[in-house]
Amino acid sequence: MNANVSKLLNEQINKEFYSAYLYLDFANYYAAVGLDGFENWYRVQAQEERDHAMLFYQYLQNNGEDVTFEAIAKPEWERGDHMAPLKKALEHEMLITASINAIYAAVYEVRDFRTMQMLDWFIKEQGEEEKNAADLITKMELFGGDSKGLYMLNSELKARVYTAPSLVL
């Protein structure tokens, strides 16, 4: 594997673990304000992000590459109203999408077709992640200002269950 590609994939592991930390911090915020459905949604999201990190880890391992773990930064975001984590999540998912796209461009440049194929799943996944984040913002804008609407949205989010990723390495 190209050394730069290996480096970028290692960096992505850290970014995915950071995503999990960020979403656990959001879950913690929502638990503190009594929105257990939002808490559940972000706990499930954190598990998905840990899975993404482990998929990159496993891919590097399967290809005989060294895995280097770096420190995971403390999540930083402005606490404010209940919308703040939702907006930060969309912003963050857009950064992750840009990161994966940059890896894909580097992989394409060196014609690493196996890694391109693996990254195809992540590119599709990021489209779903951005849509989910944007949809939550839309729902909160529509219903979050009304206590009954917020209750219903919270109940909907409480029903989310963890599903393991479909990517098999």
Question: Can you annotate each of these PLM segments?
Answer:
Residues 1-169:
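Iron-associated oxidoreductase/ferritin-like identity signal
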